[in-house]
């Protein structure tokens, strides 16, 4: 019954690149037994609103994308909630926790370190593994035209390289659908351009402002984050509370590659808050 659903704490799930809210298809049903689960497409992705990038790519800043999600939760009458974000969704969730401190009860981020730290600690090894961070931020329309020449190849390359050749099944077509649309492809590039410009400005201003909420980090054993960053140590710099971290036997796309562990870890973390 609807009344029973609203007795459970709300949990917002946010996806990453190059995916949509469908990346949670293996985890959301099980999590909905314990939480009121909300899954949403980030601005510009999937079936969400597409806006022009604006000056300094501000319309795709994580601040604006975080506002979208808070407005969505307000519309659903959720004044306070848990949030878990993978990849780009993790960056939006991090900004949300900073800008809307009274709304976020606890935060889980999957397979990322803070944007500021990743750029400041860029090495040759990181640049080779995450070349898209430097490709997608190039001025429009260079990356857009190159990807649009063969969007299927681009999506397959991203999914295969970052997962270690995981089989995504039919959901891969849904991810590809977005990248066949010029406006959405452009929006996804604007997301990255914002991260290298306006987002860094916001992050630098907040560098010394610590969060006061429980934070969990999950990273893939075979992913770049686990190999190149001390995730717990880095995230702990941003929090007054103990940061909990767990390595998952997975590549980058943890919710699809190891859904059982993701369900277990999210449930364990959020239910104890």
Regions found by a protein language model. Name each.
Residues 20-21, 251:
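A short, glycine- and basic residue-enriched loop/turn
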Residues 7-10, 23, 38, 45-84, ...:
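Flexible "cap/lid" subdomain of the alpha/beta-hydrolase fold that forms the substrate-access gate
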Residues 242-273:
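Catalytic active-site module of serine/aspartate enzymes centered on a nucleophile-bearing elbow/loop
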Residues 13-16, 39:
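Structural cue for short, hydrophobic secondary-structure segments
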Residues 22-38:
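Short amphipathic alpha-helix adjacent to the substrate-entry channel of hydrolases
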Residues 27, 96, 265-269:
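Hydrophobic residues on the short alpha-helix immediately C-terminal to a glycine-rich phosphate/catalytic loop
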Residues 1-6:
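Short, small-residue-biased leader/transition segments that mark boundaries at the very start
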Residues 8, 16-19:
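Active-site glycine-rich loops that stabilize anionic/oxyanionic intermediates
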């Amino acid at each position: 019954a609807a009344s029973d659903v609203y007795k459970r704490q709300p949990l917002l799930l946010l996806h990453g690149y190059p995916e949509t809210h469908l990346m949670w298809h293996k985890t959301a049903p099980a999590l909905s037994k314990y939480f009121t689960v909300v899954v949403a497409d980030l601005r510009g992705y999937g079936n969400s609103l597409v806006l022009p990038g604006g000056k300094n790519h501000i319309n795709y800043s994580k601040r604006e994308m975080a506002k979208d999600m808070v407005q969505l939760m307000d519309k659903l009458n959720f004044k306070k909630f848990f949030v878990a974000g993978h990849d780009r969704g993790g960056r939006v969730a991090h900004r949300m926790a900073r800008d809307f401190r009274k709304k976020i009860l606890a935060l889980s981020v999957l397979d990322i370190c803070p944007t500021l730290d990743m750029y400041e600690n860029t090495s040759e090894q990181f640049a080779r593994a995450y070349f898209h961070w430097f490709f997608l931020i190039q001025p429009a329309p260079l990356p857009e035209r190159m990807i649009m020449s063969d969007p299927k190849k681009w999506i397959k390359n991203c999914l295969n390289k970052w997962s270690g050749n995981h089989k995504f099944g039919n959901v891969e077509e849904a991810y590809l659908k977005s990248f066949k649309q010029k406006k959405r492809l452009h929006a996804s590039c604007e997301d990255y351009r914002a991260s290298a410009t306006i987002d860094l400005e916001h992050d630098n201003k907040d560098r010394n402002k610590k969060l006061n909420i429980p934070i969990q980090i999950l990273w893939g054993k075979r992913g770049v984050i686990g190999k190149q960053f001390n995730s717990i140590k880095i995230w702990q710099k941003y929090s007054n509370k103990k940061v909990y971290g767990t390595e998952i036997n997975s590549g980058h796309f943890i919710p699809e590659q190891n859904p059982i562990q993701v369900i277990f870890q999210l449930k364990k973390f959020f239910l104890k808050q």
